Protein backbone atom coordinates (compact mmCIF):
# COMPACT_ATOMS: atom_id res chain seq x y z
CA UNK A 1 0.00 0.00 0.00
CA UNK A 2 2.91 2.36 0.75
CA UNK A 3 0.95 4.53 3.19
CA UNK A 4 1.97 4.35 6.84
CA UNK A 5 -1.15 6.15 8.06
CA UNK A 6 -3.42 3.77 6.18
CA UNK A 7 -1.49 0.79 7.53
CA UNK A 8 -1.81 2.13 11.07
CA UNK A 9 -5.57 2.56 10.66
CA UNK A 10 -6.02 -0.92 9.24
CA UNK A 11 -3.99 -2.46 12.05
CA UNK A 12 -6.01 -0.53 14.64
CA UNK A 13 -9.27 -1.61 13.03
CA UNK A 14 -8.24 -5.25 13.00
CA UNK A 15 -7.39 -4.92 16.70
CA UNK A 16 -10.64 -3.09 17.54
CA UNK A 17 -8.60 -0.10 18.73
CA UNK A 18 -11.07 2.68 18.03
CA UNK A 19 -9.17 5.19 20.15
CA UNK A 20 -6.22 5.07 17.78
CA UNK A 21 -8.57 5.37 14.81
CA UNK A 22 -10.23 8.40 16.41
CA UNK A 23 -6.90 10.06 17.17
CA UNK A 24 -5.52 9.51 13.67
CA UNK A 25 -8.66 10.60 11.81
CA UNK A 26 -9.05 13.67 14.00
CA UNK A 27 -5.80 15.08 12.61
CA UNK A 28 -6.74 14.75 8.91
CA UNK A 29 -7.98 18.02 7.43
CA UNK A 30 -8.13 17.51 3.67
CA UNK A 31 -11.59 16.18 2.68
CA UNK A 32 -10.21 13.71 0.12
CA UNK A 33 -7.58 12.40 2.49
CA UNK A 34 -10.13 12.14 5.29
CA UNK A 35 -12.55 10.08 3.20
CA UNK A 36 -9.71 7.86 2.02
CA UNK A 37 -8.56 7.16 5.57
CA UNK A 38 -12.09 6.55 6.86
CA UNK A 39 -12.44 4.06 4.03
CA UNK A 40 -9.23 2.31 5.07
CA UNK A 41 -10.32 2.10 8.72
CA UNK A 42 -13.90 1.04 7.99
CA UNK A 43 -13.50 -1.41 5.12
CA UNK A 44 -11.90 -4.03 7.34
CA UNK A 45 -13.52 -7.31 8.35
CA UNK A 46 -15.02 -7.25 11.83
CA UNK A 47 -15.66 -3.52 12.34
CA UNK A 48 -19.24 -4.36 13.33
CA UNK A 49 -17.88 -6.29 16.33
CA UNK A 50 -16.36 -3.26 18.08
CA UNK A 51 -17.68 -0.03 16.57
CA UNK A 52 -20.79 0.16 18.78
CA UNK A 53 -18.53 0.49 21.82
CA UNK A 54 -17.12 3.66 20.27
CA UNK A 55 -20.58 5.00 19.36
CA UNK A 56 -21.73 4.49 22.94
CA UNK A 57 -18.57 6.00 24.41
CA UNK A 58 -18.84 9.19 22.32
CA UNK A 59 -22.55 9.69 21.59
CA UNK A 60 -22.15 13.34 20.56
CA UNK A 61 -19.46 12.68 17.98
CA UNK A 62 -20.33 12.01 14.35
CA UNK A 63 -17.01 10.25 13.72
CA UNK A 64 -17.89 6.85 15.23
CA UNK A 65 -21.19 6.89 13.32
CA UNK A 66 -19.30 7.67 10.13
CA UNK A 67 -16.97 4.72 10.65
CA UNK A 68 -19.91 2.49 11.60
CA UNK A 69 -21.87 3.52 8.51
CA UNK A 70 -18.93 3.08 6.16
CA UNK A 71 -18.08 -0.22 7.84
CA UNK A 72 -21.63 -1.46 7.34
CA UNK A 73 -21.22 -0.92 3.59
CA UNK A 74 -18.20 -3.23 3.63
CA UNK A 75 -20.10 -5.67 5.87
CA UNK A 76 -22.95 -5.69 3.35
CA UNK A 77 -20.64 -6.44 0.44
CA UNK A 78 -19.17 -9.31 2.41
CA UNK A 79 -22.63 -10.90 2.35
CA UNK A 80 -23.25 -10.13 -1.32
CA UNK A 81 -19.83 -10.94 -2.75
CA UNK A 82 -18.14 -9.10 -5.61
CA UNK A 83 -19.80 -10.87 -8.54
CA UNK A 84 -22.51 -9.50 -10.77
CA UNK A 85 -26.10 -9.58 -9.55
CA UNK A 86 -26.90 -12.74 -11.50
CA UNK A 87 -24.41 -14.68 -9.34
CA UNK A 88 -25.89 -13.62 -5.98
CA UNK A 89 -28.47 -15.77 -4.17
CA UNK A 90 -31.71 -14.40 -2.74
CA UNK A 91 -30.69 -14.93 0.90
CA UNK A 92 -27.40 -13.14 0.34
CA UNK A 93 -29.29 -10.23 -1.19
CA UNK A 94 -31.56 -10.01 1.85
CA UNK A 95 -28.57 -9.75 4.18
CA UNK A 96 -26.91 -7.30 1.81
CA UNK A 97 -29.84 -4.88 1.79
CA UNK A 98 -30.44 -5.23 5.52
CA UNK A 99 -26.87 -4.21 6.27
CA UNK A 100 -27.04 -1.37 3.76
CA UNK A 101 -30.02 0.03 5.67
CA UNK A 102 -27.87 0.07 8.81
CA UNK A 103 -25.26 2.02 6.87
CA UNK A 104 -27.84 4.47 5.53
CA UNK A 105 -29.26 5.11 8.99
CA UNK A 106 -25.82 5.91 10.40
CA UNK A 107 -24.70 8.05 7.50
CA UNK A 108 -27.96 9.96 7.31
CA UNK A 109 -27.43 10.97 10.93
CA UNK A 110 -23.83 11.94 10.13
CA UNK A 111 -24.93 14.26 7.33
CA UNK A 112 -27.56 15.81 9.61
CA UNK A 113 -25.07 16.42 12.41
CA UNK A 114 -22.08 17.49 10.31
CA UNK A 115 -23.66 19.86 7.82
CA UNK A 116 -20.35 20.94 6.30
CA UNK A 117 -18.73 17.52 6.02
CA UNK A 118 -18.33 15.83 2.64
CA UNK A 119 -17.44 12.30 3.77
CA UNK A 120 -20.89 11.26 4.97
CA UNK A 121 -22.41 12.28 1.65
CA UNK A 122 -19.59 10.58 -0.27
CA UNK A 123 -20.40 7.25 1.37
CA UNK A 124 -24.08 7.89 0.70
CA UNK A 125 -23.20 8.12 -3.00
CA UNK A 126 -21.99 4.53 -2.69
CA UNK A 127 -25.26 3.63 -0.97
CA UNK A 128 -27.33 5.25 -3.71
CA UNK A 129 -25.82 2.78 -6.15
CA UNK A 130 -25.70 -0.24 -3.84
CA UNK A 131 -29.31 0.19 -2.70
CA UNK A 132 -30.43 0.65 -6.31
CA UNK A 133 -32.02 4.01 -5.60
CA UNK A 134 -31.50 5.15 -9.18
CA UNK A 135 -29.21 7.53 -11.01
CA UNK A 136 -31.19 10.65 -10.06
CA UNK A 137 -30.95 9.95 -6.32
CA UNK A 138 -27.28 9.02 -6.51
CA UNK A 139 -26.60 12.21 -8.46
CA UNK A 140 -28.47 14.24 -5.84
CA UNK A 141 -26.16 12.82 -3.18
CA UNK A 142 -23.16 13.45 -5.42
CA UNK A 143 -24.16 17.10 -5.79
CA UNK A 144 -24.36 17.38 -2.00
CA UNK A 145 -20.72 16.30 -1.89
CA UNK A 146 -19.80 18.84 -4.57
CA UNK A 147 -21.41 21.65 -2.58
CA UNK A 148 -18.89 20.90 0.15
CA UNK A 149 -15.85 19.81 -1.87
CA UNK A 150 -16.32 20.22 -5.65
CA UNK A 151 -13.58 17.83 -6.80
CA UNK A 152 -14.04 15.09 -4.23
CA UNK A 153 -12.22 12.08 -5.67
CA UNK A 154 -14.15 9.12 -4.22
CA UNK A 155 -17.51 10.75 -4.87
CA UNK A 156 -16.62 11.18 -8.54
CA UNK A 157 -15.36 7.61 -8.77
CA UNK A 158 -18.57 6.19 -7.35
CA UNK A 159 -20.73 8.47 -9.48
CA UNK A 160 -18.89 7.06 -12.49
CA UNK A 161 -19.69 3.55 -11.30
CA UNK A 162 -23.37 4.47 -10.99
CA UNK A 163 -23.31 5.53 -14.63
CA UNK A 164 -21.88 2.19 -15.82
CA UNK A 165 -24.34 -0.08 -17.66
CA UNK A 166 -24.04 -2.72 -14.93
CA UNK A 167 -25.56 -0.23 -12.46
CA UNK A 168 -28.29 1.14 -14.69
CA UNK A 169 -26.38 3.70 -16.73
CA UNK A 170 -24.85 3.50 -20.19
CA UNK A 171 -21.46 3.72 -21.83
CA UNK A 172 -22.45 7.09 -23.25
CA UNK A 173 -23.37 8.50 -19.82
CA UNK A 174 -20.24 7.07 -18.24
CA UNK A 175 -17.85 8.51 -20.85
CA UNK A 176 -19.61 11.86 -20.91
CA UNK A 177 -19.21 12.19 -17.15
CA UNK A 178 -15.51 11.26 -17.29
CA UNK A 179 -14.72 13.64 -20.15
CA UNK A 180 -16.75 16.54 -18.75
CA UNK A 181 -14.94 16.12 -15.45
CA UNK A 182 -11.58 16.04 -17.24
CA UNK A 183 -12.43 19.25 -19.07
CA UNK A 184 -13.55 21.12 -15.94
CA UNK A 185 -11.19 19.83 -13.23
CA UNK A 186 -8.19 21.82 -11.98
CA UNK A 187 -4.85 21.08 -13.70
CA UNK A 188 -3.09 18.09 -12.15
CA UNK A 189 -6.25 16.73 -10.53
CA UNK A 190 -6.33 12.98 -9.84
CA UNK A 191 -9.79 12.95 -11.42
CA UNK A 192 -8.18 12.45 -14.81
CA UNK A 193 -8.20 8.81 -13.76
CA UNK A 194 -11.94 8.68 -14.52
CA UNK A 195 -11.10 8.47 -18.23
CA UNK A 196 -9.07 5.23 -18.09
CA UNK A 197 -11.53 3.87 -15.54
CA UNK A 198 -14.42 4.43 -17.94
CA UNK A 199 -12.56 2.84 -20.84
CA UNK A 200 -11.61 -0.18 -18.75
CA UNK A 201 -15.25 -0.61 -17.71
CA UNK A 202 -16.31 -0.39 -21.37
CA UNK A 203 -13.58 -2.86 -22.38
CA UNK A 204 -14.82 -5.28 -19.72
CA UNK A 205 -18.33 -5.27 -21.19
CA UNK A 206 -17.25 -6.23 -24.71
CA UNK A 207 -16.82 -9.74 -26.16
CA UNK A 208 -13.36 -11.07 -26.96
CA UNK A 209 -11.96 -9.43 -30.05
CA UNK A 210 -14.18 -6.38 -29.86
CA UNK A 211 -12.65 -5.47 -26.49
CA UNK A 212 -9.09 -5.22 -27.86
CA UNK A 213 -10.26 -3.38 -30.97
CA UNK A 214 -12.12 -0.87 -28.81
CA UNK A 215 -9.43 -0.03 -26.29
CA UNK A 216 -6.70 0.04 -28.93
CA UNK A 217 -8.58 2.52 -31.13
CA UNK A 218 -7.08 5.91 -31.97
CA UNK A 219 -9.92 7.73 -30.21
CA UNK A 220 -9.49 5.86 -26.92
CA UNK A 221 -5.70 6.16 -27.03
CA UNK A 222 -5.92 9.91 -27.62
CA UNK A 223 -8.26 10.30 -24.66
CA UNK A 224 -5.93 8.30 -22.42
CA UNK A 225 -2.97 10.52 -23.29
CA UNK A 226 -5.02 13.68 -22.83
CA UNK A 227 -6.20 12.48 -19.41
CA UNK A 228 -2.67 11.57 -18.32
CA UNK A 229 -1.28 14.89 -19.53
CA UNK A 230 -3.92 16.80 -17.60
CA UNK A 231 -3.54 14.76 -14.42
CA UNK A 232 -0.69 12.43 -13.42
CA UNK A 233 1.76 13.88 -15.98
CA UNK A 234 0.86 17.52 -15.35
CA UNK A 235 3.39 19.72 -13.48
CA UNK A 236 0.68 20.64 -10.95
CA UNK A 237 0.02 17.00 -10.04
CA UNK A 238 0.83 16.14 -6.42
CA UNK A 239 0.81 12.64 -5.01
CA UNK A 240 -1.65 12.32 -2.19
CA UNK A 241 -2.94 9.28 -0.29
CA UNK A 242 -4.28 6.63 -2.69
CA UNK A 243 -1.99 7.79 -5.51
CA UNK A 244 -0.96 4.21 -6.47
CA UNK A 245 -4.50 3.51 -7.68
CA UNK A 246 -4.35 6.38 -10.16
CA UNK A 247 -1.10 5.21 -11.70
CA UNK A 248 -2.17 1.56 -11.77
CA UNK A 249 -5.31 2.47 -13.71
CA UNK A 250 -3.33 4.45 -16.28
CA UNK A 251 -0.73 1.67 -16.50
CA UNK A 252 -3.35 -0.99 -17.23
CA UNK A 253 -5.22 1.17 -19.74
CA UNK A 254 -2.01 2.00 -21.60
CA UNK A 255 -1.04 -1.69 -21.60
CA UNK A 256 -4.40 -2.73 -22.99
CA UNK A 257 -4.28 -0.02 -25.65
CA UNK A 258 -0.83 -1.18 -26.78
CA UNK A 259 0.95 1.95 -25.55
CA UNK A 260 3.66 0.10 -23.64
CA UNK A 261 6.13 2.99 -23.56
CA UNK A 262 3.56 5.13 -21.76
CA UNK A 263 2.75 2.17 -19.52
CA UNK A 264 6.44 1.79 -18.62
CA UNK A 265 6.47 5.39 -17.43
CA UNK A 266 3.60 4.58 -15.07
CA UNK A 267 5.28 1.39 -13.85
CA UNK A 268 8.34 3.48 -12.96
CA UNK A 269 6.17 5.56 -10.66
CA UNK A 270 4.30 2.59 -9.20
CA UNK A 271 7.30 0.46 -8.30
CA UNK A 272 5.90 -2.57 -6.50
CA UNK A 273 2.77 -0.78 -5.23
CA UNK A 274 0.32 -2.82 -7.28
CA UNK A 275 -3.36 -2.20 -6.44
CA UNK A 276 -6.10 -4.79 -6.74
CA UNK A 277 -8.19 -2.49 -8.91
CA UNK A 278 -8.13 -2.56 -11.89
CA UNK A 279 -5.80 -5.51 -12.47
CA UNK A 280 -8.26 -8.02 -11.00
CA UNK A 281 -10.40 -7.46 -14.10
CA UNK A 282 -7.84 -9.55 -16.01
CA UNK A 283 -7.14 -12.34 -13.52
CA UNK A 284 -4.64 -12.71 -10.70
CA UNK A 285 -3.76 -9.15 -9.70
CA UNK A 286 -0.05 -9.55 -9.01
CA UNK A 287 0.59 -12.02 -11.84
CA UNK A 288 -1.09 -9.81 -14.46
CA UNK A 289 0.67 -6.70 -13.16
CA UNK A 290 4.09 -8.35 -13.23
CA UNK A 291 3.52 -9.82 -16.68
CA UNK A 292 2.58 -6.50 -18.24
CA UNK A 293 5.31 -4.61 -16.42
CA UNK A 294 7.81 -7.08 -17.89
CA UNK A 295 6.35 -6.57 -21.37
CA UNK A 296 6.46 -2.79 -21.03
CA UNK A 297 10.05 -2.81 -19.82
CA UNK A 298 11.09 -5.11 -22.66
CA UNK A 299 9.76 -2.55 -25.14
CA UNK A 300 11.85 0.25 -23.58
CA UNK A 301 14.92 -1.97 -23.39
CA UNK A 302 15.10 -2.92 -19.73
Q: Residue spans of the language-model regions?
A:
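Intrinsically disordered, low-complexity segments enriched in Gly and acidic/Ser/Thr residues
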Residues: 207-249, 255-256, 261-262
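Compositionally biased, long intrinsically disordered regions
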Residues: 1-24
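A short, ordered amphipathic alpha-helix with a cationic face
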Residues: 8-12, 38-42, 129-130, 238-240
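C-terminal structured domain segments
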Residues: 246-282
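Short coil/linker segments at helix-helix boundaries
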Residues: 27-58, 70-187, 192-225, 270-273, ...
Amino acid sequence: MGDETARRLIDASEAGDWRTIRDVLSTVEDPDDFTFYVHRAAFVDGVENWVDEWVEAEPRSSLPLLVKGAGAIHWAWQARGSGRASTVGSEAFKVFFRRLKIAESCLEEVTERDRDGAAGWAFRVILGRARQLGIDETRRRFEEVRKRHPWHVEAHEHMLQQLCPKWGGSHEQMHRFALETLEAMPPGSPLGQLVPAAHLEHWLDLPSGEDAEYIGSDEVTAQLFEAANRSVLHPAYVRRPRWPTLHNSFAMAFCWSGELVAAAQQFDVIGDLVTEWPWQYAGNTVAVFQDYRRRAYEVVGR
